[in-house]
Design a protein with these regions (language model features):
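Catalytic phosphate/metal-binding cores of nucleic-acid and nucleotide-processing enzymes, i.e., regions
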Residues: 1-83
């Protein structure tokens, strides 16, 4: 199964709403057998346990982007997703 990177808004307007949206899209694509999703929004839980500077998370995201077969940009403004 191909690996899909899902990018989109995280903090604006509400992190919980945005994380929920990204997870739901990922679930649908996975359950249809289309992609194995990588959802960087879920690092919010990791960050709650081990806070790191934003550059740390961007570095992790860039490594994952190199390995993904496809990229999906969710609608909405996002400085990080558009970087």
């Amino acid at each position: 199964m191909k690996l899909l990177y899902i990018a989109g808004p995280y903090t604006n307007p509400d992190p919980i709403v945005n994380v929920n949206a990204a997870i739901r899209v990922g679930m649908v694509l996975y359950e249809r057998g289309l992609f194995l999703p990588h959802i960087p929004h879920t690092t919010m839980l990791w960050h709650l346990i081990e806070p790191r500077p934003i550059r740390y998370w961007y570095g992790l995201d860039l490594h994952m982007l190199e390995r993904c077969d496809a990229f999906l940009r969710l609608p909405g403004e996002s400085t990080g997703a558009d970087a």
